[in-house]
């Protein structure tokens, strides 16, 4: 019998936030050591529960979730996301057809990079980073290239460093705003500068906005897609943090900006969504 081993493409893929770090923490807890876990954004672990009406709504409509849906997600859910983008986030022209629902943003990050990257493509990622972005880029045989976020400047992106890191292999810029792990919220001026870089170099912006409704000090949050309607921006969000529903796995990615020229990518994303049949339905009926 041949030995069962992993594929070589996993050789440099790491995700220790849920790997060795968590395993060691669990070992310490088993030995009676008090461990405060700051590595995973899981509100339930801190007794931050979902609003009761969310559970009531799910129970009321649970039977409706027994069958498959459109691979992009239920139309009513996609329309709700589109309305949120247009009315709350001021992103122009978003319709339900621009929305892909997923089993959390994590699944959609991997699906998006699978559809987007060729071997050797470079993706600019903020440092410090949320490690899933690095892991998924490497898994898809891309190359993560890190741009600095300076603590002395309230962890804002170093625009000059972003410009220095661009090559003819650069495909996209990852923006995590509000930022995980630093907590920084980028002002409009920084977002406009990043959008201008994407405009100049024909880059796609991948904007992870998972924490946009978990802002404790009242600062405003702006979606970069609202400031740059002429730039293709994939905007990621979900209910894990805003509604404290991490375990329900409700996320979405919205293809914002010009529709012309994105048709092939949308078809590719639809193909990948179809291969997993559909996202979980019970939380979005």
What are these regions (language model features)?
Residues 55, 226-285:
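Conserved core segment of the aminotransferase class I/II
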Residues 65-196, 213-227:
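Conserved core of the PLP fold type I
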Residues 209:
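Walker B catalytic acidic pair
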